[in-house]
Amino acid sequence: MLMPKRTKYRKQMKGRNRGKAHRGNSIAFGDIAIKAIEHGRIDSRQIESARVAMTRHVKRAGKVWIRVFPDKPLTAKPLETRMGKGKGSVEKWVMNIKPGRIVYEMLGIEEGLAREALALAQSKLPFKTKIVTCESENEIY
C-alpha cells in the first residue's frame, strides 16, 4: 500500500476539491495514459488494484507509471461510538483528483493491448476517466 513514510502532522482537515489540475495534467513518461475527467478521491487500495489489473493483462511487458500518490490521511471513528472525544484515527490514505490529472501511463506496449489494460484499470477507479495518447492529449476534457 502506498503511504507517506512520515508526515509533519498525523491528521488533516477535509478541505475542498475544486478547480482543474494544473500539475500532472500532461503525459510525461509514456505514450498512452488514463486522464481523470471529473473530481474524485483515490485511495491506496484502488491505486494498487488498478495497477495489478493492468500489469497482469499485459503480462508484465512494457512499463507502467503511477502518477498519483496518496498523501492525505482520512480519519474515521469506530462504529457505534458516541460523538465527541476527538477526531478518529487514520483509516486510509487518499489523494484528491481534479479533472485533467494523469493517473497512469504506459510505454512499450502495442496500442490495442494497452487500451484493453487501461480499460480494466478504469473500471477500478471511483471517478470518470478517459484514455489519452500523446497525439490526443491536447483535447479539452
Swiss-Prot record:
Stretch list, region Disordered: 1-23
Annotated Gene Ontology cellular component terms: cytosolic large ribosomal subunit
Keyword RNA-binding annotated: yes
Keywords, comma-separated and alphabetical: Ribonucleoprotein, Ribosomal protein, RNA-binding, rRNA-binding, tRNA-binding
PROSITE patterns: RIBOSOMAL_L16_1, RIBOSOMAL_L16_2
UniProt entry tagged with the keyword RNA-binding: yes
SUPFAM superfamilies: Ribosomal protein L16p/L10e
Any one GO biological process: translation
GO terms, molecular function: rRNA binding; structural constituent of ribosome; tRNA binding
Function: Binds 23S rRNA and is also seen to make contacts with the A and possibly P site tRNAs.
Family recorded in the similarity comment: Belongs to the universal ribosomal protein uL16 family.
Assembly with partners or alone: Part of the 50S ribosomal subunit.
Protein's UniProt name: Large ribosomal subunit protein uL16
Source organism per UniProt: Helicobacter acinonychis (strain Sheeba)
Lineage of producing organism: Bacteria, Pseudomonadati, Campylobacterota, Epsilonproteobacteria, Campylobacterales
Gene designation per UniProt: rplP
